[in-house]
Amino acid sequence: MTKNIHDQRILILDFGSQYTQLVARRVREIGVYCELWSWDVEEADIREFNPDGIILSGGPESVTEENSPRAPQYVFDSGVPVLGVCYGMQTMAEQLGGKVAGSNEREFGYAQVKVSGESAIFKDLEATQDVWMSHGDKVVEIPADFVKVGETDTCPYAAMANEEKKYYGVQFHPEVTHTKGGLQMLENFVLGVCGCERLWTSESIIEDAVARIKEQVGDDEVILGLSGGVDSSVVAMLVHRAIGDKLTCVFVDNGLLRLNEGQQVMDMFGDKFGLNIIKVDAEERFLEALKGKSDPEEKRKTIGHVFVDVFDEESKKLKNAKWLAQGTIYPDVIESAASKTGKAHVIKSHHNVGGLPDDMEMGLVEPLRELFKDEVRKIGLELGLPYNMLYRHPFPGPGLGVRVLGEIKKEYCDLLRRADAIFIEELHAADLYDKVSQAFTVFLPVRSVGVMGDGRKYDWVVSLRAVETIDFMTAHWAHLPYDFLGKVSNRIINEVEGISRVVYDISGKPPATIEWE
């Protein structure tokens, strides 16, 4: 490796926008490392991080309010290029001597920015830009050493620049796909203005992670809880590439997995990739612990506690394991840090965000803790994991434990597994699987009268659920073709003995959640 992939870096200060993580993902897509910190970070931390550029995010506050967030003064004293986005532009303008005012006209949605003059931020872009706005306040007077470089019909200063100091502000959101030239604008800032190189690639991330794992664990042995999900699977491949047979994976089959999932995990990681895997068949133990429990939160906690107990028991059998590998990813770190400190800046600390016992007396190996989910999937492909596994729809940690409503019984899980497998199989066959964001089946603990041949039956009901979403914060129910739904329903009722009725969930989020429990 010729250059350290962390040497060139962008700092993003978070003012609370729902799009802030998207800004970070876009910078990473461009090929440059970045971190996301809270707006009120200490000057010493910025100095230590030594960024090549700083981006001030959007946010829900109003600069006109007395105690609203402000960028640390050092941001403007550091000599580093700065890009302010939406609220970030407003606080930049106000802090550097301009004026911001509230507006009676809130600008939300599409707008056309007329680019004026020549600015590095709009290099190689047309004079009119379709952008995405989301603001109430607006800059009404720019600082003395700035020039206007963009406007809309209702926003006189949609973009401003101080080319000498390399300060730029845009009132719109370049990070969202609705802003057609947004990625080019971010590239212009990150690569052009800040002078960064594209060092952050899937290949370089893997090379860096493998080197760091080797340096961290040396000749010690490592244990990993392998679930077959995206994160733990990619961790398994990375750690195995670094230390080979010194990695032992523990796969706990809790009886709450999808059809044949346990065997698929063993076939792929044991037979195909040659990893050391211990399979623990703990179905009876989980079902016994869940007996009589119908409250969703109680079920979740029970499943979590039993998993920890089982994993702890297995880890103690591996006397030489000194390290625990986990699939912690960057959003976990941000969320965990924010909940503990109110700030999103603790990427270097190694707190346990995975819920495993604090007394395990093992060091943590977390090779994905700097990565977003889309980056994890990309390096998974590079490591040889199959596309259909990496891009599978999300599956909840408690598994079928939250897709069987009420009390969990083996009979219910077995019926649900088979019904769900039919639904997913038909989605693939109809080329619909990748057109929906998440699809699954839910077991309802109610019986319904049905007719089979000349006889009547009184059997269980399942609900099909399919949604379309960008961020899983909001979702629309998927308008699947009636003929398709009819085919799935007929197959389930005819092929899964014990189910007499199939319904389709047409609830959006909000008001409903995506999962039923």
Curated annotation (Swiss-Prot):
MF GO annotations: ATP binding; GMP synthase activity
Give the catalysed reaction(s), semicolon-separated: XMP + L-glutamine + ATP + H2O = GMP + L-glutamate + AMP + diphosphate + 2 H(+)
UniProt-listed Enzyme Commission number(s): 6.3.5.2
InterPro entries per record: Class_I_gatase-like, GATASE, GMP_synth_C, GMP_synth_GATase, GMP_synthase, GMPS_ATP_PPase_dom, NAD/GMP_synthase, Rossmann-like_a/b/a_fold
**PROSITE patterns reported for this sequence:** GATASE_TYPE_1, GMPS_ATP_PPASE
Q: What class of enzyme is it?
A: ligase
What protein is this chain from? GMP synthase [glutamine-hydrolyzing]
Tell me the classification of the organism that encodes this protein. Bacteria, Pseudomonadati, Pseudomonadota, Gammaproteobacteria, Vibrionales
Q: Its gene?
A: guaA
